């Protein structure tokens, strides 16, 4: 039974490899990133920029790698989940890195203004 599951996982990895993006920079929780997203409106497509703090990251090295990004849109906090290997994502750029001690930053949801700032790492 175990041999069949390993064969299946190897088969899944071989199918996923061509679809995994290689030009994505290393993104950690707490980073402030800028993300380009292709949005289709009617018959036209345009690129929408989204900038925010990464609250969570899931499945680091697979095709299903996703991250939760918290953006501020017109003074309201908006959280969106993005799949990094999606063809709709055109680019990802790390703007700022922060010193954090948590794996998930969900506590930032409750903080407002200066209380929600993270300590920046200067490298």
Swiss-Prot record:
Cellular component terms per the entry's GO annotation: chloroplast; mitochondrial large ribosomal subunit
Superkingdom of the source species: Eukaryota
MF (Gene Ontology): structural constituent of ribosome
Subcellular locations according to the entry: Plastid, Chloroplast
Signal peptide: none
GO BP annotations listed: translation
Spans traversing the lipid bilayer: none
Main location: plastid
Swiss-Prot/TrEMBL keywords: Chloroplast, Plastid, Ribonucleoprotein, Ribosomal protein
InterPro entries membership: Ribosomal_bL19, Ribosomal_bL19_CS, Ribosomal_bL19_sf, Translation_prot_SH3-like_sf
Family: Belongs to the bacterial ribosomal protein bL19 family.
UniProt protein name: Large ribosomal subunit protein bL19c
Originating species: Pyropia yezoensis
Gene designation: rpl19
């Amino acid at each position: 039974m175990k041999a069949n599951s390993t064969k299946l996982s190897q088969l899944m990895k071989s199918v996923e490899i061509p679809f995994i993006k290689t030009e994505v920079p290393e993104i950690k929780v707490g980073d402030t990133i800028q993300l380009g997203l292709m949005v289709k409106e009617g018959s036209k497509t345009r690129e929408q920029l989204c900038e925010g703090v990464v609250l969570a990251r899931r499945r680091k090295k697979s095709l299903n790698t996703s991250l939760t990004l918290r953006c501020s849109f017109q003074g309201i906090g908006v959280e969106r989940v993005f799949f990094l290997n999606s063809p709709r994502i055109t680019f990802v750029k790390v703007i700022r890195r922060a010193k954090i001690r948590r794996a998930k930053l969900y506590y930032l949801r409750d903080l407002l203004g200066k209380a929600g700032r993270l300590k920046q790492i200067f490298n």
